[in-house]
Amino acid sequence: MLSQVYRCGFQPFNQHLLPWVKCTTVFRSHCIQPSVIRHVRSWSNIPFITVPLSRTHGKSFAHRSELKHAKRIVVKLGSAVVTRGDECGLALGRLASIVEQVSVLQNQGREMMLVTSGAVAFGKQRLRHEILLSQSVRQALHSGQNQLKEMAIPVLEARACAAAGQSGLMALYEAMFTQYSICAAQILVTNLDFHDEQKRRNLNGTLHELLRMNIVPIVNTNDAVVPPAEPNSDLQGVNVISVKDNDSLAARLAVEMKTDLLIVLSDVEGLFDSPPGSDDAKLIDIFYPGDQQSVTFGTKSRVGMGGMEAKVKAALWALQGGTSVVIANGTHPKVSGHVITDIVEGKKVGTFFSEVKPAGPTVEQQGEMARSGGRMLATLEPEQRAEIIHHLADLLTDQRDEILLANKKDLEEAEGRLAAPLLKRLSLSTSKLNSLAIGLRQIAASSQDSVGRVLRRTRIAKNLELEQVTVPIGVLLVIFESRPDCLPQVAALAIASGNGLLLKGGKEAAHSNRILHLLTQEALSIHGVKEAVQLVNTREEVEDLCRLDKMIDLIIPRGSSQLVRDIQKAAKGIPVMGHSEGICHMYVDSEASVDKVTRLVRDSKCEYPAACNALETLLIHRDLLRTPLFDQIIDMLRVEQVKIHAGPKFASYLTFSPSEVKSLRTEYGDLELCIEVVDNVQDAIDHIHKYGSSHTDVIVTEDENTAEFFLQHVDSACVFWNASTRFSDGYRFGLGAEVGISTSRIHARGPVGLEGLLTTKWLLRGKDHVVSDFSEHGSLKYLHENLPIPQRNTN
């Protein structure tokens, strides 16, 4: 065996350190079926990420974001993770995924250790096979599968199963790790090995030597000879956890080896405040030891020695010893493929045990507060909601100096880290704050007839009337980048529409967002609804927020097209309002006015090229090529220092063309523009439908018939005639402000203001009406009469 280790490229080590060790290498994988090898090779979608690893041990990590610095990691695989649902045999797919993730982390320079169950299940499968082989032909023919199970299970003693399964389990791990050029070593321990000082030193030395040589130790209790569990005791004045199961073994091993992180995988999502499956059970994101009294434990899992209570006790003991702990689900098919690497990357998976008490409410608690506050907000009178918004507008001007001081801190910290356009978005000024205040007062004025407005009234039958009324959507999550002025705008729209609101701003605007949120809550407090608008801590990952489908009803991203695409991809069961791209077109018709074209092109492209409603593709009618109008357009673009990209057709007309466009479906967001030639208005429409993003498209022409044809046939959220693309904006549309621009085809489209944040519900008022009254022989008949809609007093 030592020679095999040497042939793997490692130096041999002292033999006296090997009382429990069985090294496994590439030379002993002949007993594994080729199908298993192929299955392992199919798992290859985890990226290799290089991170600085400065930790060896010390205090446990305070936050999830610090877990990426963990160097030494123990992964404990529970019986429910390793075994199949029938508890006989191993779950090969899950094991293949786990081995791949462990290998990826090992190859990043981390020191990985596995504590695994599964020997009993593997041995049970093998012994059942032996029982079947030992039967006579007559017994085999007359014994059904269920009869075999009933006969076999009582006679299979767990220790015998463990003895029969250890070698096969290790051979399986060996074959899997071999695919990633990693060696593994098996170590079997009992509780006595931790209580005997000499054995503890030998075990510690063996593990350190294996880690030094880049070998993954695979540790398990020696279930073939394990004695009954002993009570927890003191070891030289230190509280010591007894090795009663693999949970306590993993905790004991993690502390003995001064491990940075212990990952405990089981068949539940993590630690709940009450038994999973109960109506009010909620997953605990961060567990602080002082909160133990708030947790109620249920029964243990379907297999294994311990339940969640045993896991928590082991986790708290490890945490006390300086090891961070995460308990997570290793069986869920949607997350198990990356659960280990996701935990190490700091993603919100399972329950993170921390000795640092969370400074504020969790995002789940914030979601509940926003829900409750939003419902209270919706019950206020329209005048009260308008009063809150007016008060917020006053605070923006009254507290101007404090706001600008906070914004100055953000700008100073961002200097040299952000590009000039982003710094411009980040910057606040007196004029910006004054414009914000004006916009908020417009929202307040338009909010008088929003929530509770009757859209339809129908008399179903005598004394049975139906109404359709507007109501808030619920809880909105608005994610925005670099623009702190977005916060009061969106907050005012949420207040006017009676929605609860979660705000997630970029860390580059942390100081500005903090003071603007405080002012928003101050305005809300005048009517006792302070909690309706919540600012999410910057530590929360956007991807984690997008998974809160039970907390959030609508996500509205405000930022780059890449941000929108990422959120649309990450959102799990939550609708996203927005547009991933703003590829806006302008078609210059053969009947276009010379004076209008250059003004419209300049304003659409050069006024604010980073905006989502800026012009990106200019379509020119072919009859305009080599005309004074075309020359004026090109000269103006050169003066404005706009880089031109030639489309394929346009390039064919030129002897010396600008750089040919790489893609006709490009949002430049800068002083760059694609020019392409089209044959007629229909050709322009076809081009827009093929390469556009359904955002904003314009025709420039003096021919009214051509213009109307374009307006009616272009399928975009905004279609203009002789107007700049930059008019595609909520403020310019008279909406007061907008939460974003939507290119979706349901609910809201184009600039989305107050109306886009409302939905409807039906109110039916009757007097002891039942459906059977309207049957063929019933006493009532359907009337379905449209009734007049009462006008609300908005003064």
From Swiss-Prot:
Isoform Short: Inhibited by L-ornithine with a Ki of approximately 0.25 mm. Isoform Long: Insensitive to ornithine inhibition. This is due to the two amino acid insert which abolishes feedback inhibition of P5CS activity by L-ornithine. CDD domains: AAK_P5CS_ProBA, ALDH_F18-19_ProA-GPR. It is found in: Mitochondrion; Mitochondrion matrix. ATP binds at residues 266-267, 305-311. Its main location: mitochondrion. SUPFAM superfamilies: ALDH-like, Carbamate kinase-like. Residues 362-795 are annotated as: Gamma-glutamyl phosphate reductase. GO terms for biological process: citrulline biosynthetic process; glutamate metabolic process; L-proline biosynthetic process; ornithine biosynthetic process; proline biosynthetic process; response to temperature stimulus. Pfam families: AA_kinase, Aldedh. It catalyses: L-glutamate + ATP = L-glutamyl 5-phosphate + ADP; L-glutamate 5-semialdehyde + phosphate + NADP(+) = L-glutamyl 5-phosphate + NADPH + H(+). One of its GO terms (molecular function) is glutamate 5-kinase activity. Residues 1-361 are annotated as: Glutamate 5-kinase. In the N-terminal section; belongs to the glutamate 5-kinase family. Can form homodimers/multimers. HAMAP family: ProA (MF_00412), ProB (MF_00456). It is linked to Cutis laxa, autosomal recessive, 3A: A syndrome characterized by facial dysmorphism with a progeroid appearance, large and late-closing fontanel, cutis laxa, joint hyperlaxity, athetoid movements and hyperreflexia, pre- and postnatal growth retardation, intellectual deficit, developmental delay, and ophthalmologic abnormalities. This is Delta-1-pyrroline-5-carboxylate synthase. It comes from Homo sapiens (Human). The gene is ALDH18A1.
